[in-house]
Amino acid sequence: MTRKNTTTNPWAKFHGPNLGYVIEQYDLYVTGAGSVDPELQELFEIFGAPSFQDDVVTGDNTATHFSPQNTGNIEKILKVVQLVEQIRSFGHTLAHINPMEDAANGQSLLEKAMNELSDADLKAIPAKTVWQDAPEGIHTALDVIHRLKDVYTKSLAYEFSHIQDSEERTWLHQMVESNSLRQPLSNKKRTALLKRLTAVEGFEQFLHKTFVGQKRFSIEGVDMLVPVLDEIVLEGAKNGVEDVMIGMAHRGRLSVLAHVLEKPYSHMFAEFKHAKIEGAVANSGWTGDVKYHLGREQVVSNEEVSTRVTLANNPSHLEFVNPVVEGFARAAQENRKKSGLPDQDISKSFVILVHGDAAFPGQGIVSETLNLSRLNAYQTGGTIHVIANNAVGFTTDSYDSRSTKYSSDLAKGFDIPIVHVNADDPEACLAAANLAIQYRMLFKKDFLIDLIGYRRYGHNEMDDPAVTQPQVYKKIKNHPTVRAIYADQLQAAGVLNADEVETITQFTQEQLKSDYAQVPPADTSDATIHVKVPDVVAKGIQPIDTGVEIDSLRAINEGLLSWPEGFNVYPKVKKILERRKDALEENGKIEWALAESLAFASILQEGTPIRLTGQDSQRGTFAHRHIVLHDTDTNETYSPLHRLPNINASFSVHNSPLSEAAVVGYEYGYNVFAPETLVMWEAQYGDFSNTAQALFDQYVSAGRAKWGQKSGLVLLLPHGYEGQGPEHSSARPERFLQLAAENNWTVANLTSAAQYFHILRRQASILGTEAVRPLVLMTPKSLLRHPLTLSTASQLSEGRFQPALEQENLGTKPNKVKRLVLSTGKMAIDLAAEIESGKHEYNLDEVHVVRIEQLYPFPAEKVQSIIKRFKNLEEIIWVQEEPRNMGAWHYMAPILFELAGDKVKTGYIGRPDRSSPSGGDPFAHKAEQELIVAHALDVKYNFRQDKQEIEVFSN
């Protein structure tokens, strides 16, 4: 029996979907059709049917008491609740977000739900029954539906239902459903917005008419991109952001440069005209780049606030700038002037990435970069993504470029809120921008704006888009610009009259003409096919003493082998570390990993921060580094490099995600923005680095020549043929050597721990100077602990890096030497092992071996001085483990030919040309390697006559 209590109403706390559930449960309770939760059953027994004293207003302005039990409206209430949630979740399918379409084409789901409810049904249900936070003036469910349709199905459309965090979801819905997001703009701001659109349109049209046929990749059709960026930058500045980093491709870039980054029109025109004007291409390198690839840095001020805006230099490789700019932001956020990990302040900077609608789902680098967004080593506190969506990629329609409804759908998998907005509705676009920046500042996470417009012209201005999209371009031809649409709206609202609109247009035109008049005639007087590399780059890295006193090294080593009391180091690791205890004593030997740690510590003590990332970099792929220790009982971590004395620079080492391209781009960007930091990326195996080839090609090797963008990034690429097959043998040194020119980077393949120590310290010493350049290191695998690569303390404390080393105990009888063998890396160690084994019958008086430690720039003077000692030299041989069409041979061949002169022959010993880097049979590999070594050291062996496929001679 129901014991109805009328003094309190527990149902008041139930709203929306929760209320629908309670009503449904009461129906089951009354009919006995199913089991009801005991707690709810008790509530029903005490309080009866769910009922609400609410504001369904009657004719005499009194509130009626609404009870589902009395009206039989349970089913209808449930349908309304479901409809409300469907509008929130799927309203975007009804929204008018595409200016080239009259209406949305995905209406069936919501239409079906709405057709099941009459207006009378909706009027009978109180608003707060289905919407707890219904604003003032919303009384009935009908009002609710009208209001929510107005919010979710107009020029703005939202996708929030995939967001996992309920707090974020609630905040987002409250923001868009309240009046706070779309407060009417003041007349002053509306006029300013029209002026901005007039400037954007006027600039593009001026270029179109003045520089006919020249590529500019017009913004027209998504003109609102500029005001959207303006708004985000301004709101960021108001929140105290010091740096805003922008990454974008070429579409609309010139307009963004001219307006958001305030690049003078005269400078833009000078680049089109090939005229000399001071500062026109201020950030260009010696080879330069096309105008729509160049970046800019500018302090932007507005409304008494300012911030530095950086538009990153960018190649036409779409989206590859994304991780680079994220690296910029992280570097700007971190304080590296203390020991331990750097301090990150995510309020200092944020990133805006402008994507293309075809590139966002099409380029894998996008998802790789999105995956970095929540990772401790890479997160930057939230990126604002803007898809400049013109619904076509070159000539490819969207149905051929993606498998999803929206170009933004990829972002759903990363829990990113999405707003679609019609680019022909300027005020809606600004509302989207405001929501984006508020969300980023509050939740420190990514946000995406899908700015849907069109492309007024072809992919470039010489292209006729009507050839492939004839129907849509008929529409576009007759479609008014967003400036014209907004001008009409302001006139209709009485904000401006026609004369005032015309005055704004004329002012823009006069400004453009005036700036164009400042540009002198074209000047090709200095045009030349010979590009002059700056002297400081051309002369290369000068010799630098990089030794560290033995006492300092011993003190460092002691610190490296200590950890907090009670910290339980894994026994196997502890044993490895304890072996290093006496490494710096008189008879001690220093292996590769210890030399690295000693180099790191000494670099830190000199005030240079270090950042090292890569797959498995904390331990090291080959279980050699152990720079981060794990407590066996608590899994807490500890790095001795964080506790060493006399350090005032940060050290961070992170295991990266299973990505090469995004991580390389990120580390490159970090180093560009933190030039004082030794930034290192380590491949798990060098073989896998080629998935970042675009970054090596477009940024690391060429960034300074194209853009004047300096980097000292270090690439650690494990390399060496050990019979492990084609995926675990080669870092493809031939590719880095092919890209080597103009002293753009250093490529090395070292053979001792001391050499590694010195080259790291040399690299640290050139950071922040004009001599800086990237360092590409082919690092060892089996050589990490090889006896012939170990070094002594004196080798670390004295001298410097040597670009070439002579094999000890050879060449002692110069007049007898007939063959000079050059090799590098593991091949050189294999030769040394054979020489020192004493198990051969070669006449080693006739052979001398030189290890080329630094492949590029080639140490020609050093090698030439060695050659001059051997008056009876007959041949110079290059020996390598890679196939002939790989490795260093094709780089070395012309160098050897020049060194040899007319009287000395040159030759190659190694594997023949092959399509795969390495065979898969370790026994075959071993046999080949032994044959290469034997033939290289046996002067009597006439390999020019031999038909075996193990070596090839080339004169």
Curated annotation (Swiss-Prot):
The entry's family comment says:
Belongs to the alpha-ketoglutarate dehydrogenase family.
A Gene Ontology cellular-component term: oxoglutarate dehydrogenase complex
Keyword rRNA-binding recorded: no
How it assembles, according to the record, is: Homodimer. Part of the 2-oxoglutarate dehydrogenase (OGDH) complex composed of E1 (2-oxoglutarate dehydrogenase), E2 (dihydrolipoamide succinyltransferase) and E3 (dihydrolipoamide dehydrogenase); the complex contains multiple copies of the three enzymatic components (E1, E2 and E3).
Query: Which molecular function GO terms apply here?
Result: oxoglutarate dehydrogenase (succinyl-transferring) activity; thiamine pyrophosphate binding
* Any one GO biological process: tricarboxylic acid cycle
* Entries under NCBIfam families matching the protein: 2oxo_dh_E1 (TIGR00239), PRK09404.1 (NF006914), PRK12270.1 (NF008907)
Annotated protein name in UniProt = 2-oxoglutarate dehydrogenase E1 component
Q: Which UniProt keywords apply?
A: Glycolysis, Oxidoreductase, Thiamine pyrophosphate
Cofactor(s) the protein requires to work:
thiamine diphosphate
- Entry keyword Oxidoreductase: yes
Q: What does this protein do?
A: E1 component of the 2-oxoglutarate dehydrogenase (OGDH) complex which catalyzes the decarboxylation of 2-oxoglutarate, the first step in the conversion of 2-oxoglutarate to succinyl-CoA and CO(2).
Q: Which domain of life is it from?
A: Bacteria
Gene that specifies this protein = odhA
Gene3D superfamilies linked? 3.40.50.12470, 3.40.50.970, Multifunctional 2-oxoglutarate metabolism enzyme, C-terminal domain
Reaction(s) catalysed by this chain, per the record, are: N(6)-[(R)-lipoyl]-L-lysyl-[protein] + 2-oxoglutarate + H(+) = N(6)-[(R)-S(8)-succinyldihydrolipoyl]-L-lysyl-[protein] + CO2
Enzyme class at the top of the EC tree: oxidoreductase
> Could you tell me the EC number(s) of this protein?
1.2.4.2
